């Protein structure tokens, strides 16, 4: 059985990750650096899938001036690289975790995509993405790419690869949902923004998820933070709660969950097994400073500790 996945990250970043007990505004804050990683949501997903034994191809945009860290990562992991290089620098995101687990992001600006860059990307990506079983589109839109252009590309992509996994936020999320991807993973707040109302009870969240499904989206996975995740599809509704772990960094936890979801779906696992796996992969990511799976035994132990129940 073919098991090929592509991930698209239009606006990747170098993640500078650090820890400080408490951020004091207006003061000098001492930060312990825990890592500097070539990252981006789709790239994080690709790392998880590669660790799980899936062949992955990555694509999107990279800034010409500081692409070396990404090229080195792809080479080390054995990931096929279809990124398009554009003028400028890939942005740097600073992510600081405090002792209470709160994460504050400082996302800097990066390269700008010109109309010619975008036209080339659209034509090139649509020429090769159709050969994959699943395509994961993750992250924000870079400067120069309008929500309308993104919706058009997503719609055209769906006609070539029906199984699109989509994970984004803000204007990119709204634009991408219009193309009715196969699976989406908003968090609760993002779902509230889409629904135009507060969703205080789990029943409200499920009703909003079904409203998304009525638009042609087969799978809706709602990230609930420490409370876990809710999955709604034609077969049912399930909620998974992660085990308690020592939080090192929450950076990439959502991307790790997406990687676990894709793996389970590729392997034709049940919804219950897939959600349990994805929740365990996310919990594992929280307990370390970077995404990835280095110990399958540890992952299996984490899966056994996930509390998964059908929602009644």
Language-model segments: what does each one mean?
Residues 174, 202-312:
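Conserved phosphate-binding/catalytic region of the ribokinase-like
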């Amino acid at each position: 059985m073919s098991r090929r996945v592509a991930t698209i990250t239009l606006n990747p970043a170098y993640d500078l990750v650090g820890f400080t007990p408490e951020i004091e505004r207006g003061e000098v804050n001492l930060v312990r650096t825990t890592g500097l990683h070539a990252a981006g949501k789709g790239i994080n997903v690709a790392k998880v899938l590669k660790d799980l034994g899936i062949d992955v191809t990555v694509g999107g945009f990279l800034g010409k001036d500081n692409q070396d860290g990404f090229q080195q990562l792809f080479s080390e992991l054995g990931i096929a690289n279809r990124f398009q290089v554009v003028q400028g620098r890939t942005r740097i995101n600073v992510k600081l975790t405090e002792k209470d687990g709160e994460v504050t992001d400082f996302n800097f600006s990066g390269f700008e995509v010109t109309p010619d860059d975008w036209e080339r990307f659209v034509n090139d990506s649509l020429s090769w993405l159709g050969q994959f079983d699943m395509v994961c589109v993750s992250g924000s839109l870079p400067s120069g790419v309008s929500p309308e252009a993104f919706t058009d590309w997503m719609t055209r992509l769906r006609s070539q690869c029906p199984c699109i996994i989509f994970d984004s936020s803000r204007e990119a999320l709204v634009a991408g949902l219009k193309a009715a991807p196969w699976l989406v993973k908003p968090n609760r707040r993002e779902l509230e923004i889409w629904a135009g109302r507060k969703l205080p009870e789990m029943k409200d969240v499920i009703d909003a998820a079904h409203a998304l499904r009525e638009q042609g989206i087969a799978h809706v996975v709602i990230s609930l933070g420490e409370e876990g995740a809710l999955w709604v599809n034609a077969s049912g509704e399930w909620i998974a709660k992660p085990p308690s772990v020592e939080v090192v960094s929450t950076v990439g936890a959502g991307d790790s969950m997406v990687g676990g979801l894709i793996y389970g779906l590729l392997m034709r696992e049940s919804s219950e097994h897939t959600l349990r796996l994805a929740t365990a992969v996310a919990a594992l990511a929280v307990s370390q400073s970077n995404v990835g799976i280095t110990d399958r035994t540890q992952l299996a132990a984490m899966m056994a500790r996930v509390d998964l129940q059908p929602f009644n």
